[in-house]
A protein has these predicted regions:
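Alpha-helical structural signal in soluble globular domains
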Residues: 10, 14-17, 49-53, 145, ...
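Active-site loop of short-chain dehydrogenase/reductase
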Residues: 15-23, 58-60, 96, 102, ...
């Protein structure tokens, strides 16, 4: 809570004091019931704080939602690591990959280079979004499909985590396309070249 909420308030204060545009890192978890996860709740509250600051105090701010970011530099051996990083680390150690639940939950995966490209376009643009910019591919895969992309790896299925949602998929929002943004990186190619 302190990082996502207190940290957001501090960044807002800084942006207001210095008159700079704020780009807030939201999350695709915003499209699900925020009461199912402390993380989702704090991201939801952060977005609402930013919107309130825009509406009442004229804060120049844009909210950007990310979808399962992967790529070079990602965390691999941390409780904060995303699934691609965790699986890379497990495979490198010769360990099985861990799949929570049945593996049929679907995720929209977005490469870090595409995220950075989108963030730069949003930061440099005069355009605003009344809600949030969505940086995702618009295509999702089941975790079993992603595991297949890694080839013949041992899998261990464990009980699903409470609050784990069944699907993420970038909503059909053409606003980001008007900035000339489109994802260029393909998950399967990235995994093949690891």
């Amino acid at each position: 809570f302190s990082v996502n909420l207190d940290g957001t308030k501090e960044v807002v204060r800084y942006a207001k004091r210095n008159g700079c545009k704020l780009i807030y890192s939201g999350s695709s978890s915003r499209h699900h019931n925020p009461e199912l996860s402390p993380y989702a709740m704090t991201k939801h509250m952060g977005e609402e704080w930013i919107k309130m600051e825009r509406r009442i105090f004229g804060l120049r701010a844009e909210i950007v939602r990310f979808y399962n970011v992967y790529g070079p530099g990602e965390l691999v051996d941390s409780h904060m690591a995303a699934v691609i990083g965790k699986w890379r680390a497990a495979i490198k150690k010769g360990e099985p990959i861990v799949i929570y639940g049945d593996g049929e939950q679907r995720r929209d995966f977005t490469h870090i280079d595409d995220i950075v490209d989108g963030l730069i376009r949003i930061a440099e643009s005069y355009r605003t979004h009344e809600d949030a910019w969505e940086l995702g591919t618009g295509k999702n895969y089941s975790l079993n499909e992603v595991a297949d992309m890694f080839g013949d790896v041992k899998r261990v299925y464990v009980d699903d985590v409470k609050g784990n949602y069944r699907e993420t998929l970038r909503i059909n929002d053409d606003a980001i396309n008007r900035l000339g943004w489109a994802p260029k990186n393909i998950l399967k190619e990235y995994i093949k070249n690891l």
